[in-house]
Amino acid sequence: MIHAVLIFNKKCQPRLVKFYTPVDLPKQKLLLEQVYELISQRNSDFQSSFLVTPPSLLLSNENNNDEVNNEDIQIIYKNYATLYFTFIVDDQESELAILDLIQTFVESLDRCFTEVNELDLIFNWQTLESVLEEIVQGGMVIETNVNRIVASVDELNKAAESTDSKIGRLTSTGFGSALQAFAQGGFAQWATGQ
């Protein structure tokens, strides 16, 4: 199972934080910092992309009889330019399959954004999350075909654009003007003007 997907830059600024296992917010931040410390100190030329998890972060103190043990958790990452794409998985997942999944994720983002960069992920976070949701849901991999992933995300983007254009048409009508005036507190002024 995939427990978390983290994307952060070389300054430990998160660009995506998605947990599929319940983890308290303070522990999420601590986990991100510890994963960053572990990864940033590694020499990617001589060391693998596989790590063991920081101690006791995925287990809450109240939930000691949870089936997840830290010895079963791995951190698998890949560095692209200024970003680290990191998956936190249990030992049931193949390390090489997760590395391939990271590659699929990045290729899908490249196709959606045409040469993805960090700013694309910041300003188009909805597309970033949509791509991830097409690949992983509930901690399980559901799609690995880049063409299908991109087609699904394109459909979502087209649906969002058509919804936005319908909202734009609504605001140009009298009803839309009424809603806009009412929201701004000038409903009486609008009503007398009609």
Swiss-Prot record:
Primary localization: Golgi
Recorded superkingdom: Eukaryota
Leader peptide range in chain numbering: none
Biological process terms in GO annotation: Golgi to vacuole transport; intracellular protein transport; protein targeting to vacuole; vesicle-mediated transport
Localisation per UniProt entry: Golgi apparatus; Cytoplasmic vesicle membrane
Keywords linked to the UniProt accession: Cytoplasmic vesicle, Golgi apparatus, Membrane, Protein transport, Transport
Membrane topology according to the record: Peripheral membrane protein
Pfam families from the UniProt entry: Clat_adaptor_s (PF01217)
PANTHER family in the record: ADAPTOR COMPLEXES SMALL SUBUNIT FAMILY
Primary role: Part of the AP-3 complex, an adaptor-related complex which is not clathrin-associated. The complex is associated with the Golgi region as well as more peripheral structures. It facilitates the budding of vesicles from the Golgi membrane and may be directly involved in trafficking to the vacuole. Required for the transport via the ALP pathway, which directs the transport of the cargo proteins PHO8 and VAM3 to the vacuole.
Family according to the record: Belongs to the adaptor complexes small subunit family.
Name of the protein in question: AP-3 complex subunit sigma
Organism: Saccharomyces cerevisiae (strain ATCC 204508 / S288c)
Organism ancestry: Eukaryota, Fungi, Dikarya, Ascomycota, Saccharomycotina
Gene name of this polypeptide: APS3
